[in-house]
Curated annotation (Swiss-Prot):
Keywords: Early protein. Possibly contains a TATA-binding domain. Belongs to the asfivirus B263R family. This is Putative TATA-binding protein pB263R. It comes from African swine fever virus (strain Badajoz 1971 Vero-adapted).
């Protein structure tokens, strides 16, 4: 019978690259006020379910669970984070809870600059991120704000991708120590800042310097799942994906192994 690692690569060696979560962003007209001033001006209404800020909180009836409350300090030895107001939210921001297709999104708005962040975006075309920002602008246009609010730009802030090896047998796994050793000795598309060897055979982690000051992390797991984390463009993820796919194709005999058949 043929070795199962060879059977692993009779068709596609790895699955296709997929985005699994993104922090989407945008910029709107500067509101020319601070978050402290804006939270006092806003009046909660659809489509916003809740508003949270270090200096005020509001919600529609039935959405009380979305109101943030101060957390108790668990580690007394750790130096406390510098906060403002009640410390429940990101400094300088107002957080709005907005629904899109049965998923609640937590938009962050920095009113003095007009910057917007929407974590947890899951649609590959960013439809959900754009919709949430548009709903926020529609909400602001019905508030007692003198300035006309417009969307200036949309942008991706951080995108996470995933793929995995495509084995026939679930007993085919990645030899993590050998994978880490390969990363140290073969040419890479971007300089590698650091490689963290597997701890207790859980994963290998490496950081690629895709541009000055910008790191993208990869996590390679024992059973073949591979994450590419912290990209700001799909292009950089695709370059790293192609590199890893080729590495697996060329060196599969070194980095793949087959677990014994259970008794």
């Amino acid at each position: 019978m043929e070795d199962e690692t060879e059977l692993c690569f009779r068709s596609n060696k790895v699955t296709r690259l997929e985005m699994f979560v993104c922090t989407y962003g945008g910029k709107i007209t500067s509101l020319a006020c601070s978050h402290m001033e804006l939270i006092k001006m806003l009046q909660i209404a659809e489509p916003v379910k809740a508003l949270n800020c270090n200096f005020g909180h509001q919600c529609l009836p039935g959405y009380e669970s979305l109101i943030k409350t101060p957390k108790k300090t668990k580690n007394m030895l750790r130096r406390p984070r510098k906060t403002e107001g009640d410390g429940t939210c990101f400094n300088s921001a107002i957080e709005a809870s907005i629904l899109f297709k049965d998923k609640m999104y937590k938009l962050k708005c920095f009113p003095s600059t007009g910057e917007i962040q929407v974590p947890g975006v899951i649609f590959p075309d960013f439809e959900d991120g754009k919709n949430i920002i548009q709903q926020w602008v529609d909400f602001l246009q019905h508030q007692p704000i003198e300035k006309k609010i417009q969307i200036i730009e949309f942008k991706t802030i951080m995108i996470n991708f995933k793929f995995q090896i495509n084995p026939v047998s679930p007993r085919v796994i990645i030899h993590l120590k050998k994978f880490a050793a390969l990363l140290e000795h073969i040419p890479t598309p971007y300089p590698i800042r650091e490689i963290k060897p597997p701890l207790e055979d859980s994963k290998v982690s490496a950081k690629f310097m895709v541009s000055p000051g910008k790191k993208v992390r990869i996590n390679v797991f024992l059973k073949g799942k591979i994450n590419i984390l912290g990209c700001n463009t799909k292009e950089s993820a695709e370059i790293i994906y192609t590199f890893l796919k080729d590495l697996i194709s060329v060196h599969w005999q070194e980095i793949l192994c087959v677990l014994p058949v259970p008794d």
